[in-house]
Amino acid sequence: MSENAKFADYVQNNIRGIGEDTAFLGMSNVWVREAIAHNYAQNFTWLGRPVIQVPQDVYAIQELIWACRPDLVIETGIAHGGSLILTASMLAMLDYCDAVEAGVVLDPKASRRKVVGVDIDIRPHNRAGIEAHPLAHKISTIQGSSVAPEVFEQVKAHAMGYDRIMVFLDSNHTHEHVLAELELYAPLTSKGSYCVVWDTGVEDLPDHMCADRPWGKGNNPRTAVREYERLLAGEGLTAADGERLMFEKDKTIEHKIVITASIDGFLRRI
């Protein structure tokens, strides 16, 4: 066994141990709850734009994009645009590495790799910040409800011709909305890639932390994921590529980062 393989095996053993340590996972969930009380995830930027993510989830995004090498990422929920910039920067890094390996000169604006962001309200100052960013050429934005038919038709038009698609769902966190998003967007996910449902951790929050929101315990992204799993197992669904649509929860990435907003939210298409 090579040294690289030995280290990879060592890491997998670490992750398995974490997954079996319910006390450690429980403490991490308490930490996340306390961090939310301090608006911790709102304190970070990515290449100059606010990114509303805990840093460990940013690591997860990096690992997933590097492993899956998507040519299109679809994101619902834009906010300040930091997540779009994060994704665009990772796609640009894939372009760079491809050019280095091929020994060719890179034209940054010639790549087909793109990220499409959807939000019901792209505020003017956020749109201006996104459009002024050097990575704006890799980003397309659509304003409107992510589950509106006319909006989803635009997303599908963007997705035409792409065969390695990744999906991030991070807009309205009610059960009804997230389930509708899953029914529309999850089938666009390419086999071997991911549909990540953010903020499933709402299910673990005390009621007072969601009192000013239309979502909360029993009505959130995790309950939507559970319902979608029942639909997949029951009636069976078809992916956009015409094949049977099946997902599995990737607990390995979750146990690797431990601190995450998305317990049971990393869905890998199989």
Residue ranges of predicted features:
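Residues that form generic nucleotide/phosphate-binding pockets
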Residues: 10, 14, 30, 34, ...
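Class I SAM-dependent methyltransferase Rossmann-like catalytic core
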Residues: 29, 33-68
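Poly-acidic low-complexity segments
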Residues: 4, 21, 54, 145-148
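S-adenosylmethionine/decaboxylated-SAM
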Residues: 49, 58-270
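N-terminal auxiliary segments of SAM/dcSAM-dependent transferases
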Residues: 1-28
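Short, compositionally biased "basic patch" segments
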Residues: 23-37, 121-126
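Short, mixed-charge, low-aromatic patches
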Residues: 12-22, 41-47, 138-140, 179-186
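Alpha-helical interaction segments
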Residues: 20-22, 34-37, 50-52, 152, ...
